[in-house]
A protein has these predicted regions:
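Active-site and adjacent substrate-binding regions of carbohydrate-active enzymes
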Residues: 1-352
């Protein structure tokens, strides 16, 4: 019987660049994390979520990965990473990593090979289009602004959900999926206890690539491009071939997954152990600068979610993450920020399910 150990675990997120610098170069590193393991253990931490530490040009804070098997040398060596895993295990602390497989860096070997030879095998790992009028293939918008399409010197266009330096991976390609699964196994065999899976609801595309209707002045087309029909085929396969073989924790960053889709993602037979529900995020961005109103909106959304999904599956409750401002600044006026107001917000994480 599967032991859902993560249900009883306290997870601590570490952004390695700013966490602890062990050698005085101004950048956090693996040895710095090792130095703080006893402190983290005393805090009651069971799991460390370490944000991207892979080889990367750092265009998007490490979410643009140029080599899934190598760590970024600014943090140390692969041996240092293995030492961190070992030292954490001695203290009964598990480590989960970011898994970024919707896209990679344009400096990744796969994309670089395609740039040299458009007929190579790796060309099928990405989405390329040509147009007759020199205009973008459609009106889809990047999450970072502008078109999802960038043009190559030879006139072709390649697809990117986020920055132009992050070409999207083509999950329709079986050979690519196997490469991804091999990498997942490699890290799990190293002793990693699971993954926080980045932008996973974007991996299935509308292969018609037809333009979508838009609202005047809106950044994105009206019809969503996340959790697209057919995505379950890929997610079930990844779960069966990778996650089910290990008693690991998986938490999906799941924009576009509403309460109606929650069970598919985090239910008893869901694709993942749990999800981050982004229905609660960015309350301060709704044309209302009143923090009191922001709290009311946030509370309503959270309570609705918990009431709907209680007993269906597991959802990671959070107040902020690395993509958002600090919750104290989000929900409180400056003069009201104190130990007591911070404690009141923090108590929500523990009491929401009681």
């Amino acid at each position: 019987m599967k032991n859902n150990w993560w249900k009883e675990s306290v997870v601590y997120q570490i952004y390695p660049q700013s966490f602890m610098d062990s050698n005085g170069d101004g950048i956090g590193d693996f040895n710095g994390i090792i130095q703080k393991l006893d402190y983290l253990q005393n805090l009651g931490v069971d799991v460390l979520w370490i944000c991207p530490m892979y080889a990367s040009p750092l265009v998007d804070n490490g979410y643009d990965i140029s080599d899934y098997y190598k760590v970024n040398p600014i943090f140390g060596t692969n041996e240092d990473m293995e030492h961190l895993i070992e030292e954490a295990q001695k203290r009964k602390i598990k480590i989960i990593l970011d898994l970024v497989v919707n896209h990679c860096s344009d400096q990744h070997e796969w994309f670089q090979k395609e740039m040299k030879d458009p007929n190579c095998e790796e060309a099928s790992y990405f989405y390329f289009r040509t147009t007759e009028n020199d205009k973008e293939p459609n009106n889809w918008r990047s999450n970072f602004g502008g078109s999802v399409w960038s043009r190559l010197p030879d006139g072709r266009w390649y697809y990117h959900t986020f920055a132009k330096e992050q070409p999207v991976l083509n999950w329709e390609c079986k050979e690519l999926r196997q490469k991804i699964y091999e990498m997942i196994h490699w890290w799990l065999e190293k002793g990693i206890a699971g993954f926080r899976i980045d932008a996973i609801t974007f991996i299935k595309k509308d292969l018609s690539f037809a333009s979508r209707p838009t609202n005047d002045g809106e950044l994105y087309p009206v019809e969503k491009l996340t959790d697209y029909k057919g995505i379950g085929t890929f997610l079930d396969e990844m779960k069966e071939q990778c996650f089910d073989k290990y008693n690991c924790m998986t938490v999906a960053e799941a924009p576009g997954v509403d309460d109606a889709a929650f069970e598919r993602y985090a239910g008893k037979n869901g694709y993942f152990s749990m999800i981050f529900d982004f229905g609660w995020e960015n309350m301060e961005g709704e044309n209302d600068k009143s923090s009191i109103h922001a709290v009311e909106r946030w509370k309503k959304k959270m309570f609705t979610h918990v009431a709907h999904n209680s007993g269906i599956g597991w959802s990671a409750i959070f107040l902020e993450n690395h993509d958002q401002s600090r919750c104290l600044n989000k929900f409180l006026e400056r003069e009201n920020i104190s130990f007591y107001s911070a404690s009141a917000l923090a108590s929500i994480l523990s009491l929401i399910h009681i």
